[in-house]
Amino acid sequence: MNYKPRTKVIAGNWKMHKCKDEALEFIQKVSLQVPDQTQVQTLIFPQLTLLDPLVQLQGANLQVGAQNMFYETEGAFTGEVSPQNLLSLGVKHVLLGHSERRTLFGETDQTVNLKLLSALKHKLVPTVCVGESLLTKENNQTQMFLDQQLTNIFAGVPEEALKNMIIAYEPVWAIGTGKSANPQDANKTIEQIREKVTALYSFQASCAIRIIYGGSLSVANIKSILEQPAIDGILAGKASLQTEDFLFFAQIASKQVLVSTKDIFQKNDCPFCY
């Protein structure tokens, strides 16, 4: 299996924000100023209706992805979008399993797994969300919960696919609440997620997959988050809506040292691949 170095990821989930004119203006401005893709990968996940016009403006430095997709290719599934439809628009990335999809629309680990398998089958690049509730955190069951969530979601996923995927750790209690995880705590949890990937697959596979953090990000805490050695980037919600803030996130990320997989394999004393 061949692996590429892990670059930082700066992703924005716009949720149900921005109309066409606002979105076009954002993409036009940001695409001219974001760092080179070899330094940091920048992604925007807009509403479904914005995909077509925004994909026309995406380039090497800024790409557009879908917030969701269904696992079937066609059929009587009112309100859903198929992976084939996304591909026909030129979409290459898709966000799967966001906690709002779970709490508001009844998605489960099993449906996320089906979507993940379908996305991989159709050569889409999935960003898969995982995260625990406040009750789980307060009961000190975060690691056990995430281990089971990862086991369920990754069932049937081949090891070879991991190098083209992203895991987004988004603690449910931190999404849209203004309560971001302590950077060191987020780093520790992402270390544990990588350990679980090692257990499910291999050390090499866990070194290949990128794991990012999301949850109440801001210009005030972005630097301390991205400085954490185990965190490969961010998935921002509200904080990604302002052009200046998104560019600031990308600029901070570009200053971080790229992680070379080759170097990782030479560091036998480093169990978490950073």
UniProtKB/Swiss-Prot annotation:
Gene Ontology MF, one: triose-phosphate isomerase activity
Keywords: Cytoplasm, Gluconeogenesis, Glycolysis, Isomerase
SUPFAM superfamilies: Triosephosphate isomerase (TIM)
PROSITE patterns listed in its UniProt record: TIM_1, TIM_2
Keyword tRNA-binding: no
Enzyme class: isomerase
Entry binding sites for substrate: 13-15, 176, 216
Record pathway: Carbohydrate biosynthesis; gluconeogenesis; Carbohydrate degradation; glycolysis; D-glyceraldehyde 3-phosphate from glycerone phosphate: step 1/1
Keyword Isomerase: yes
Similarity remark: Belongs to the triosephosphate isomerase family.
Assembly mode: Homodimer.
Descriptive protein name: Triosephosphate isomerase
